[in-house]
């Protein structure tokens, strides 16, 4: 029988596998071009050749994109949060730590996310411009402004709903107590850290 922990792990691993499957064709905008490269049905298996990357030492492995990286940093932010009210700020700090891995910028006493020590989470995997731009503003003490409707918010917020199912009631609102609105609100706020158009953060609340 599968435990709740098994299901949460399966959700995160399944998302990472799907990301690794689609990453090689993320920037191929024609299905015809995908068919030329992978056959009539398109890409149906993990591509381990990594011909689209410069990281030749990784050939033989399927790699994840910035989507999985940011998903795991969301999870780390949730784990670091002491209370539900603190979670938004903890997630933002986690995103800033991810930002540092992508830009090679340095900041003292900014070391809450142990996962950034994982080599694959330090590699630059086509990070979205909106995420980098918004986090750069926050990093430099400026308010972020954009009108982005992109999917960069929703692609990383699954851990909020997953973790809310196991956090104790005195630490965080539990979904099983029918307080789904609080989880929806936090998911929207996490997406709004970088994507400020309503269509950039509202889908995260409805995910």
Where are these regions (language model features)?
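Structured, active/binding-site neighborhoods that engage oxygen-rich ligands
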Residues: 1-207
């Amino acid at each position: 029988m599968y435990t709740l922990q098994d299901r949460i792990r399966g959700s995160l691993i399944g998302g990472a596998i799907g990301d690794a499957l689609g990453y090689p064709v993320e920037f191929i905008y024609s299905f015809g071009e995908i068919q030329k490269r992978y056959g009539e049905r398109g890409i149906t298996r993990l591509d381990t050749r990594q011909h689209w990357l410069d990281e030749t030492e990784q050939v033989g492995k399927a790699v994840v994109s910035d989507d999985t990286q940011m998903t795991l940093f969301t999870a780390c932010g949730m784990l670091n949060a002491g209370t539900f009210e603190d979670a938004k700020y903890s997630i933002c700090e986690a995103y800033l730590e991810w930002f540092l891995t992508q830009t090679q910028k340095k900041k003292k006493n900014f070391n809450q996310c142990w996962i950034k020590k994982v080599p694959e989470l330090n590699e630059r995997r086509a990070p979205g411009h909106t995420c980098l731009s918004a986090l750069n503003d926050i990093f430099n003490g400026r308010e972020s402004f954009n009108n982005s409707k992109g999917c960069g918010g929703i692609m990383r917020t699954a851990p909020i709903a997953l973790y809310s199912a196991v956090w104790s009631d005195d630490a965080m609102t539990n979904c099983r107590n029918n307080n789904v609105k609080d989880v929806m609100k936090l998911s929207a706020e996490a997406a709004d850290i970088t994507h400020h158009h309503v269509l950039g953060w509202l889908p995260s609340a409805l995910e």
